[in-house]
């Protein structure tokens, strides 16, 4: 019972770790979770886990040198204040614990850090796993009940802290969003533009992800060329920096190449437009004009495909650049359709163009 068979209980039906899906939001569980999170806007969110059996009990703050620089200092100050309540609760039980080691707060795409970049205090708890009913570890015999007790105790200490720090937590969330707007004026980058002339599906899915994170996306009012890429209205959109989610916008779009520490517990880079292979550019200096920002896009519509065919087609061709090209090829092969690869560019004259 101490060694669970792979893929273990950590994963969902698709064998994906949902605690790494807070930014990606590719799974229905995560999509539902973020809908509730943004509707509720909690002041504190606790993230309870288990870790290696030879350890004791961890609660945040994490390793200070690995804090994400986009997370306000006040977030870590409040986390440390709340930690005092956990320490008192575990001292009363005689449980061993530690902080500021092992885990960090750099990657904002997990359950204890996504809240931090959204005006909430996220707190990670890690209990040394018993992996059964009873296990011997360097600290003696540990039972399943003991492990559960520590998690319950720190859940209750969180509630006690929230009650005592109610005003501080409410003020923090208010200030988090107001300072996001004021700080935007001092940033050199005033916004981002992204687009995909040849793939409406990729543009749709990326925009859908931004909407899930409550990031404001606007129409591009006129064609611009930035960094060697041309962006055209209808096929490119703008994300202005001056908005409540300014810090999350920076976290998703910026390319960070300098760090205060050389070690990371988790992901060290996650520039999201690159994951979608989307051309995008910073709007700063002379590239930025307020009149580039058009109406806000409240929702995107999934683009519909269309088969262009003559009366007696000899063959069909489609571009591999499209987001759904691999799926289309799979469906064709699954239906016993014979498919070929073009090994060189070609131009073909058809009845439809």
Where are these regions (language model features)?
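Intrinsic-disorder/low-complexity accessory segments
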Residues: 11-14, 20-21, 26-28, 32, ...
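Scaffold signal of the M16-like zinc-metallopeptidase fold and its non-catalytic homologs
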Residues: 4-10
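Detector for the c-type heme attachment site
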Residues: 50
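Carboxylate/His-rich catalytic cores and anion/metal-binding grooves
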Residues: 1
């Amino acid at each position: 019972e101490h060694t669970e068979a792979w893929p273990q209980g950590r994963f969902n039906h698709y064998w994906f770790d949902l605690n790494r899906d807070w930014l990606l939001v590719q799974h229905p569980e995560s999509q539902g979770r973020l809908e509730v999170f943004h509707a509720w806007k909690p002041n504190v969110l606790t993230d309870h886990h288990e870790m290696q059996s030879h350890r004791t009990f961890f609660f945040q703050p994490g390793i200070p040198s690995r804090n994400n620089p986009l997370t306000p200092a006040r977030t870590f100050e409040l986390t440390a204040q709340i930690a005092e309540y956990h320490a008192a609760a575990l001292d009363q039980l005689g449980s061993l614990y530690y902080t500021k080691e092992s885990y960090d707060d750099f990657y904002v795409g997990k359950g204890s850090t996504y809240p931090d970049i959204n005006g909430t205090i996220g707190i990670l708890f890690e209990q040394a796993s018993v992996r059964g009913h009873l296990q011997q570890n360097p600290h003696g015999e540990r039972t399943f009940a003991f492990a559960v007790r520590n998690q319950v105790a720190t859940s209750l200490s969180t509630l006690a802290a929230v009650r005592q720090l109610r005003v501080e937590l409410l003020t923090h969330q208010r200030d988090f969003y107001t300072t996001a707007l004021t700080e935007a004026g001092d940033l050199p980058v005033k916004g981002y533009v992204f687009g995909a002339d040849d793939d409406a599906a990729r543009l749709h899915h990326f925009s859908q992800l931004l909407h899930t994170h409550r990031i404001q996306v606007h129409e591009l009012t006129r064609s611009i060329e930035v960094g060697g890429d041309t962006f055209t209205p209808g096929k490119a959109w703008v994300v202005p920096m001056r908005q409540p989610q300014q810090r999350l916008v920076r976290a998703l779009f910026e390319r960070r190449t300098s760090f205060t520490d050389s070690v990371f517990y988790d992901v060290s880079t996650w520039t999201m437009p690159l994951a979608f292979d989307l051309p995008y550019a910073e709007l700063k200096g002379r590239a930025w004009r307020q009149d580039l920002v058009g109406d806000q896009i409240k929702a995107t519509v999934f683009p519909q495909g269309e088969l262009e065919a003559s009366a007696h087609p000899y063959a069909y061709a489609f571009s591999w650049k499209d987001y759904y090209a691999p799926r289309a090829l799979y469906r064709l092969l699954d239906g016993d359709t014979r498919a070929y690869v073009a090994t060189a560019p070609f131009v073909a004259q058809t009845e439809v163009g």
